[in-house]
Curated annotation (Swiss-Prot):
One of its GO terms (biological process) is response to antibiotic. It comes from the Eukaryota. Pfam families: Ribosomal_L44. GO terms for molecular function: structural constituent of ribosome. Disulfide bonds: none annotated. This is Large ribosomal subunit protein eL42. The gene is RPL44. Belongs to the eukaryotic ribosomal protein eL42 family. The keyword Protein transport does not apply.
Amino acid sequence: MVNVPKTKRAFCKGCKKHMMMKVTQYKTGKASLYAQGKRRYDRKQSGYGGQTKPVFHKKAKTTKKIVLRMQCQECKQTCMKGLKRCKHFEIGGDKKKGN
């Protein structure tokens, strides 16, 4: 279980010093319909003949690498930071209590 605080002090390239950053999890954007590969694929798929390219089935990984998107609260500049793989990820969860 990885628990990351909602705000974090980190170096900002815009301000050129350590600032408070707002932390969110990076999500992949929607794939464009007009990218060259998608246009080529759609052209090949159209007409008779069924599936033209192999459909990938051999999934090897069970987790994804976590990417944090950090935004400076002063200048709004963003930067990404990659983390290791983990099954459970949480932003701003309760802290673990010590003994």
